Amino acid sequence: MDFLFYFLFKLIIQSTTKMPPRDPFNSMLSLGYSMLFNEIMSNVLALGLHPYVGFMHRIAKGHPALVSDLIEEWRAPLIDSMVLAMVKRNMLTKDMFETNETGCFLNPEARKIYLQTYNKKLRSDNQYFEDKYTYRESIRQQCRKYASVIMHSDITLYEPLELR
């Protein structure tokens, strides 16, 4: 339980940090967001979409703005909820993180636990609109809906994510 209070204290006192992560909680979030980013990037590329042209994030050299746009609705239901559950269940301890001048990172043992948890979460079912899909399938479906909007110039083909 000490680990939970440590993380919640850090979460309340400090805002989330970007790269590099400076504490265990942000390290877990950062790793999850990076993995989710790659999951969405592979779907965007598989659909033949241009990952660097988005609609919410500013277009910047070398930044896949579309992927950043599409990741937003998945952060809380996937990564944030998973990390909070891991903290609540004390799945990782403070000594499973390595902190140095470049940031705070999961050690190999922690990465193994984290990756297993992440993959289990992506394989778990959720209520995606009218059907049940795994999170991985739901991400694929949402990317397809976005592609349909682009191909048919019809915004009504895309529904914002609402998981129940």
Predicted features, each with a name:
Residues 1-164:
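Active-site helix-to-loop segments that bind/position phosphate- or nucleotide-bearing substrates
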